[in-house]
Each structure stands twice: as C-alpha cells, then as structure tokens.
Amino acid sequence: MERSRVTREAPTGTRILLASLSAMVAESVTFPIDLTKTRMQLHGSGSASGAHRIGAFGVVSEIARKEGVIGLYKGLSPAIIRHLFYTPIRIIGYENLKGLIVRSETNNSESLPLATKALVGGFSGVIAQVVASPADLVKVRMQADGRLVSQGLKPRYSGPIEAFTKILQSEGVKGLWKGVLPNIQRAFLVNMGELACYDHAKHFVIDKKIAEDNIFAHTLASIMSGLASTSLSCPADVVKTRMMNQGENAVYRNSYDCLVKTVKFEGIRALWKGFFPTWARLGPWQFVFWVSYEKFRLLAGISSF
C-alpha cells in the first residue's frame, strides 16, 4: 500500500534529529564492515615491494582471532561522533540547496536533471566532510591501531579523547585536518553518487510504477546508490585512508604522491582495494539509513525525502 504523501514542511531541527538518529543506527549495524575495509586499504601501505593479498574474510578472521569480537568495533565512538555532524549537514544541506534551485527556477524538485542533483549532492558532502574531518581522522587512527594490538604492541590511543589530545599536541590544530583534501574529494564523489542516485532512482521507481513509495522502492534506490557511490569513491577512499593514518613520519607528501606511489608499488587495482567491503558496507548502510530515515519522517508527519 502506498504511503500517504504528507507535505508538512519539517523544522530544520527535527530533520537534523531524524538524520542523526538514522545515521547512528546505520553506523552501529555496519561498523565491522567499515573496519574491514580500512584494514584492507592499509594493507601494504608504504611498502615498496607491496604485500601478499588478503581478502575481506581473511581480515575479519584475523581481527576476531587476535583482538576478539570487540575488536570489530574499534573506533565506533568517533565514527558515531562524526556522523552527528556529517550526516545531518549533507542530508539537510542537499534538501535545502535543492529547494533553493527549485524556487529560483519555479520548478519542482522531482524534475531536476540528474547532473544538477549530482552537483548539489557533491557540494553538500564537501561542506559536511570539512566539518567532520577531525572525527574521521580519529576513527581511522583508532581502527588502524588494532593492527598494533594484534602484533602485541601498545596502541597509540586508548580512546577518542586521548586521540584528539595527542594529535593536537604532536601535530597541532592543522593535524586534525590531515588528509582533508582526499577526504573532501571522496565526500564529493560519495555524495554525488549516493544522494543524487538515491533521490533520482527512488522517484524513477515510483514514477514508472515499479514500486510504490515504500520499503521496496527505498531498498532498490539504496542498492543503486550504493553501487554508484562505491565505484566513484573507492580510489579517493584508499588515498584518504592512507593519508589520514600517517603520523609525524609521513610516507606520502600529499594525496597525489600517495596516489602515484600506490599505483607504482601495488598496481592500478590497489586503488580499488577494499571495493567489496566498501560496497558491502555502503549497501547495508544506505539501506538501514534510508529505510530508517524515511520511516522516521513518516512517523513525524513529514514528506518523504
């Protein structure tokens, strides 16, 4: 049965709350996959000879064996903190920017071309990522620390607060934004793929009578957006992860140097390291997020995304 089309304009505060809550649920459910992706992307980082290939299941088995099941959630707290800033800014930013374009062109939002939606989504993602980059840095560092623990070494940080403090002390305020360039490049590509594709695909599915505005339409749209955003963003994600994991003794001078060295020492395929776990995370993450967000909006009496 088609959901009722509620048209009440939602207060910005309500939309921020719903987006944050949906993101927290999605992040908690899919975080072990994100950890697997990060460990795979760091595998072979800085090695001139490359390293033997290791698959997603091998990484998960190694983490569970050496760090226990709790090791699969290493870095969850900064990840949730990040999403309290990142997701509301990009989601509400996308809706508001799209609304401005619609009002200026006296058009309706569903008729906007995909290219326009893609640019709006990318720009919203850039703004959100600049704000959330310090929390993203801490998340990556804490996820990478698990490798030290598995080798019997002491981790660099005991928690997110200590991580923030140590980074500030040793690398300065600018250190919190280390890797921000590949970070925003990835954010632009991810949100260009996710927001625009989800928005466009959902309305296409509904308009073509493939499904009504329900969980089936949301699932189809989230699968398509997950594939699009993963394909576009994976190379930038690899570079971002390696740049952000660097401490004071940097292996890479900048994101371009990281890109060149990765291809030189590990081959072009290394730019898509972690593609499967990235997609395996983005797919479920987007499914959980969008289904939750659409449901929360419906319960709050707000029109669908």
Swiss-Prot record:
Induction: By high light. Signal peptide: none annotated. GO terms for cellular component: mitochondrial inner membrane. GO terms for molecular function: transmembrane transporter activity. It is a multi-pass membrane protein. Disulfide bonds: none annotated. Belongs to the mitochondrial carrier (TC 2.A.29) family. This is Mitochondrial uncoupling protein 3.
